[in-house]
A protein has these predicted regions:
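Alpha-helical scaffold within the catalytic cores of cyclic-nucleotide enzymes
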Residues: 79-83, 111-127, 157
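Short helix/loop segment flanking the catalytic signature motif in cyclic-nucleotide metabolism enzymes
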Residues: 74-77, 101-119, 152
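PAS-associated C-terminal cap
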Residues: 1-11
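Short regulatory alpha-helical coupling segments
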Residues: 14-15, 28-48, 79-87, 105
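Conserved nucleotide-binding and Mg2+-coordinating catalytic segments in signaling enzymes
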Residues: 14-33, 54-68, 76
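A short pre-motif secondary-structure segment
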Residues: 91-94
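Catalytic-core segments of nucleotide cyclases and related cyclic-nucleotide turnover enzymes
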Residues: 113-116, 142-178
Length: 178
């Protein structure tokens, strides 16, 4: 029927609006919606929530040296490797460029550091075809009582920046609020 066809088109459009075309990961829009929902949930019911953010090291040089097709290949490779190592509850999103974030519901700082470390090791253990070893810098932040999504995102982003500043290719815990 027409209604069934319309429903399918609607579902396809929704999927397109929340996923990254290149990697198939969820996009920034979906991440923002989901983060707000998860924060509302932990504020209501308690529990834990953490973010693991990563930024591919020297990505511009990959693009400059090997071309944009190779850059796209690196992004796709990273998504596949990350997806294979995530737990079922984790949500992988591409924020844009070479930046990814994993939303980890029901996860505290210690658990999130373990998730990030496993992802970091998985990425650095296998070279990308035609490019070689590509690493990433990771930041980890757990939600703190009363914290906004923007604040949590800022802290995890600052942790990635600290990892880059400390020499890249590492996992860095965020500084607690206050």
């Amino acid at each position: 029927s027409d209604i069934t066809g319309l429903k399918l088109v609607e579902e396809e459009l929704r999927a397109l609006s929340i996923t990254d075309a290149l990697t198939g990961a969820f996009n920034r829009r979906y991440f923002q919606e989901r983060l707000e929902g998860e924060i509302a949930r932990v504020q209501r019911r308690g529990g834990a929530l953490a973010l693991v953010m990563l930024d591919i090291d020297h990505f511009k040089q990959v693009n400059d040296r090997f071309g944009h097709a190779a850059g796209d290949q690196v992004l796709t490779f990273f998504c596949q490797r990350l997806s294979q190592r995530l737990r079922r509850i984790d949500v992988l999103c591409r924020l844009g460029g070479e930046e990814f974030i994993v939303l980890c519901p029901d996860t505290d700082q210690v658990q999130a550091m373990a998730v990030a470390t496993a992802l970091w090791q998985a990425l650095r253990s296998e070279p990308v075809d035609g490019v070689g070893l590509v690493t990433a810098s990771f930041g980890v932040a757990a939600w703190e009582l009363g914290e906004s999504g923007d604040s949590l995102l800022r802290r995890v982003d600052d942790a990635v920046y600290a990892a880059k500043k400390a020499g890249r290719d590492r996992v860095q815990a965020a500084v607690p609020r206050g």
